[in-house]
Amino acid sequence: MILRNPLKSPFNSELSIFKALLMSTITESISNDYSRFISILGVCKTTDQFKQLHSQSITRGVAPNPTFQKKLFVFWCSRLGGHVSYAYKLFVKIPEPDVVVWNNMIKGWSKVDCDGEGVRLYLNMLKEGVTPDSHTFPFLLNGLKRDGGALACGKKLHCHVVKFGLGSNLYVQNALVKMYSLCGLMDMARGVFDRRCKEDVFSWNLMISGYNRMKEYEESIELLVEMERNLVSPTSVTLLLVLSACSKVKDKDLCKRVHEYVSECKTEPSLRLENALVNAYAACGEMDIAVRIFRSMKARDVISWTSIVKGYVERGNLKLARTYFDQMPVRDRISWTIMIDGYLRAGCFNESLEIFREMQSAGMIPDEFTMVSVLTACAHLGSLEIGEWIKTYIDKNKIKNDVVVGNALIDMYFKCGCSEKAQKVFHDMDQRDKFTWTAMVVGLANNGQGQEAIKVFFQMQDMSIQPDDITYLGVLSACNHSGMVDQARKFFAKMRSDHRIEPSLVHYGCMVDMLGRAGLVKEAYEILRKMPMNPNSIVWGALLGASRLHNDEPMAELAAKKILELEPDNGAVYALLCNIYAGCKRWKDLREVRRKIVDVAIKKTPGFSLIEVNGFAHEFVAGDKSHLQSEEIYMKLEELAQESTFAAYLPDTSELLFEAGDAYSVANRFVRLSGHPGTKNWKSTVR
């Protein structure tokens, strides 16, 4: 039985129809009726069915027919989207392929990104005398790799577009705009766009997307304004792109204009568009509007919730951020990381690590961005034990250990005082960037390895990596820690002469501190006096410390008074000024300062110490007794005080400036009470 019309077949499935039709070709005596095979081709749904048909056409002698070969090839490429290597086997059998066949083959190679095979095929097409059409170039341009070679090839194809008179074709123009924008040449893309593309909204979207990709958000926003002037109605894609730009430049006025446009549309806004509005308003700091839209949404997803959480985090309102975070029905990796990073930015390092522990308990696997935030928290706390565990966790879970994670590990190890481990991470890294080298220079400098830091600085330049202002700060710090005054002067001069980097306040401060420590107080003051910007209290503080160290009482008094002009409530400086006047026996001035301290109720900010024990960082503030073991700690301190008295120890109380020693002692007693007397990773400071 020959089934001429598949639609009238008694079989109730496409597979049955296909099998029946294929069987008919086997039982029929006529072998060269290719139209029969073409009709069967119409019901092929899978590559296996296609290959069965192809095999049968070869057996029955139909395959060599040029018309059938072309139909077979085009069907494989366009309807089934089959593998390109099989398509090529079909292609080479077609005698004198026309432009449609060539285009399908070029499209196939372009899709699989086969190292310029599509372009080579195009050149063969030209050799065969086949003229390209408006479909040829979009296939070629969209298939180019995004590298330097792609741009050169794309420009040559652009010349061919002009040569064959296709420069005014909209599809070709859009392909050129896309190619240039993906290669980062927005000026070239704009040149093509400005010629003829302004009637097509898809062209506008390509341009806005390109500007966003290049972080030229103001240009994206300007294009929307130009769209309105050209009476081109934006699509939802346009609005999504523009809202993304608004969120980057914090343009709340444009955000409101887009919102008004959405509100005026009769169609219901999509979830994606509502999410984009929430995110844009939150990024612009308009949290009231963002929350109002969020609450009015009929449906919300994890992106909706995350936008609100992120908005509050960026505003520094961690309380509300945590409230919304805790209410989230579903949390993804991004929402967890935002909360971890929020606490990190607020200086709540313990809380940041606690959120990470909750993330693990929830079974959520972090990514490299999460790990960078966690490692940074460990670095600030000096939590080596947790930092080591994080490194093991990264290796065990095969989290992407890229250059950013490597940089965070280097920073963490240096801040925990483990210089050797930091250097091992550096040497084990497959890739390094400017920040890697800078982290090494700064880390070595801060760990007292000035010579090694300078050696790395020169190695960095040997690798053709140019230092920046942070790198130079590390080098100057290295000279400071190692007492290399002459080299510091040379580096300070080289900032401008060799790398055109203008020294900032911190660079001047480092020079003042270094010269002061070296006893060159007058030279330090001259640098401070000639600074192109007004010195802050930190720079004056460096001069103050140096003046006290080298008994330059007049300079110390000058520096102290300058600090008090900037920070009238700085209790520590008032205390030091009292010590200066007492040392010079200027009792009248001393009484005046003390009277002022009493009159304005000035208090000095207490010092604090951090100590890591059993994977947890404990903080001790001078005079504070909130720790659970405070009673035991202070009892132990009392015992030590009595023992030192019996040992005839007389403390030096002439300088009562800093109370950090109190916090330091409390932390020290806690370590011994905890049974970890060898703990090293802790620090004492005044805030």
UniProtKB/Swiss-Prot annotation:
Region named Type E motif: 539-614
Annotated GO biological process: RNA modification
Spans of repeat PPR: 98-132, 133-168, 169-199, 200-234, 235-269, 270-304, 305-331, 332-366, 367-401, 402-432, 433-467, 468-498, 504-534
Lineage top rank: taxon: Eukaryota
Annotated stretches, region: Type E(+) motif: 615-645
GO function terms (MF aspect): RNA binding
One Pfam family of this chain: PPR
Alphabetical list of InterPro entries matching this protein: E_motif, Eplus_motif, Pentatricopeptide_rpt, PPR_At4g14850-like_plant, TPR-like_helical_dom_sf
UniProtKB keywords: Repeat
UniProt-listed Gene3D superfamilies: Tetratricopeptide repeat domain
Regions crossing the membrane: none
Family according to the record: Belongs to the PPR family. PCMP-E subfamily.
Name of protein: Putative pentatricopeptide repeat-containing protein At3g15930
Recorded name of the encoding gene: PCMP-E51
